[in-house]
């Protein structure tokens, strides 16, 4: 991968939907520790990301990077596809 541009956040997630043109919905999961019950809870966030080549399919693992606002909801860009989904 190329050198990181300073100040831009990156996330690794899974493609949840690719029904829009040049846009994918990426779900990013993280584990948090509950302070009282000492259990790990799975939390997730959904991000709309720009996919210029329409290369991503549902189930792919991708790296997304923060960018300028592209539309009302899109502020992320797909940088790299890590794993292709097995069909």
Swiss-Prot record:
One GO term of the biological process aspect? translation
Pfam families (UniProt xref): Ribosomal_S17 (PF00366)
InterPro entries xrefs: NA-bd_OB-fold (IPR012340), Ribosomal_uS17 (IPR000266), Ribosomal_uS17_bact/chlr (IPR019984), Ribosomal_uS17_CS (IPR019979)
Name the source's superkingdom: Bacteria
Q: Does the record bear Ribonucleoprotein in its keywords?
A: yes
Per the record, what is one GO cellular component?
A: cytosolic small ribosomal subunit
The reply on keyword Cytoplasm is no
Entry keyword set: Ribonucleoprotein, Ribosomal protein, RNA-binding, rRNA-binding
- Signal peptide location: none
Report the GO molecular function annotations. rRNA binding; structural constituent of ribosome
Q: Hey, which family's this protein in?
A: Belongs to the universal ribosomal protein uS17 family.
NCBIfam families per the UniProt record, alphabetical:
PRK05610.1 (NF004123), uS17_bact (TIGR03635)
Quaternary data? Part of the 30S ribosomal subunit.
Purpose of the protein: One of the primary rRNA binding proteins, it binds specifically to the 5'-end of 16S ribosomal RNA.
Name the UniProt record assigns to this protein: Small ribosomal subunit protein uS17
């Amino acid at each position: 991968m190329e050198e990181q541009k300073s100040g831009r956040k990156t996330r690794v997630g899974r493609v949840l939907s690719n029904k829009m043109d040049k846009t994918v919905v990426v779900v990013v999961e993280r584990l948090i520790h509950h302070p009282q019950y000492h259990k790990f809870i799975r939390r997730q966030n959904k991000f709309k990301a720009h996919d210029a080549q329409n290369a991503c399919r549902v189930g792919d693992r991708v790296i997304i990077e923060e960018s300028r606002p592209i539309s009302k909801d899109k502020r992320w860009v797909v940088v790299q596809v890590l794993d292709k989904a097995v069909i």
